[in-house]
């Protein structure tokens, strides 16, 4: 797919997701929209026993390891107060954390992987994870066993503090989570 065509496709996909946000474990339309787009691109969808979320797979023509690529698809219970032409049409819900962008970016990666699968060494499982904003979305996906053969899973998150075109990479945890803890330490001098 030509760059301009891909950009237009992903922009439209992003805007549709942004206009129709769904909360954790309620991502039914989002799930169906993702499935339709993946199927239209000839990308295989794995059947997993979850009501929302999608796992797809691109099998490379060459043998190799299996990797995962992950994004989150749920929105937040926040009213959107913008005048964007693609602002949320769902009262009290919006993609305030960038999950619409994450989904569009990973969908774009899936399209490119599918387009180049003859050159691909190994397999890529692509997770459109439900319920990231709750504390159990990843856990429910992992419990299905669909990622038991994966060597590593790569995820992404927008970062407004980085300049456009910059990629930030770090081993270990990078961002906050929905579970919180408090740590107190004492020292003796």
Model-derived regions, located:
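Acidic/His- and Gly-rich active-site-bordering loop/insert found
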Residues: 2-95, 104-107, 111-120
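Short Gly/Pro-enriched turn/cap motifs at secondary-structure boundaries
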Residues: 46-47, 132, 171-176
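Structural motif
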Residues: 48, 97, 127-129
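Beta-strand secondary-structure signal
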Residues: 55, 68-70, 125, 180-184
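Acidic/histidine-rich catalytic neighborhood of metal-dependent amide-processing enzymes
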Residues: 101-171
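Short, solvent-exposed loop/turn segments at the edges of secondary structure
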Residues: 149, 176-180
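Conserved small/polar residues in nucleotide/adenosyl-binding loops
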Residues: 187-188
């Amino acid at each position: 797919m030509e760059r301009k065509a891909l950009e237009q496709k992903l922009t439209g996909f992003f805007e549709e997701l942004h206009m129709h946000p769904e909360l954790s474990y309620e991502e039914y339309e989002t799930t169906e929209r993702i499935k339709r787009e993946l199927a239209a691109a000839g990308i295989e969808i794995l059947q997993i026993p979850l009501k929302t979320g999608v796992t797809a797979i691109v099998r490379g023509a060459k043998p190799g390891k299996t990797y995962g690529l992950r994004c989150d698809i749920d929105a937040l219970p926040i009213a959107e107060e913008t005048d964007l032409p693609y602002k949320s049409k769902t009262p009290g819900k919006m993609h305030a954390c960038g999950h619409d962008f994450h989904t569009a970016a990973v969908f774009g990666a899936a399209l490119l992987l599918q387009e180049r699968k003859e050159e691909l060494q190994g397999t890529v499982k692509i997770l459109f994870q439900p319920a990231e904003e709750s504390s159990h979305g990843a856990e429910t996906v992992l419990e299905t066993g669909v990622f038991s053969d994966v060597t590593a899973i790569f995820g992404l998150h927008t970062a407004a503090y980085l300049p456009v075109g910059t990629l930030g990479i770090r081993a270990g945890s990078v961002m906050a989570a929905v579970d919180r803890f408090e740590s107190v330490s004492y020292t003796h001098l």
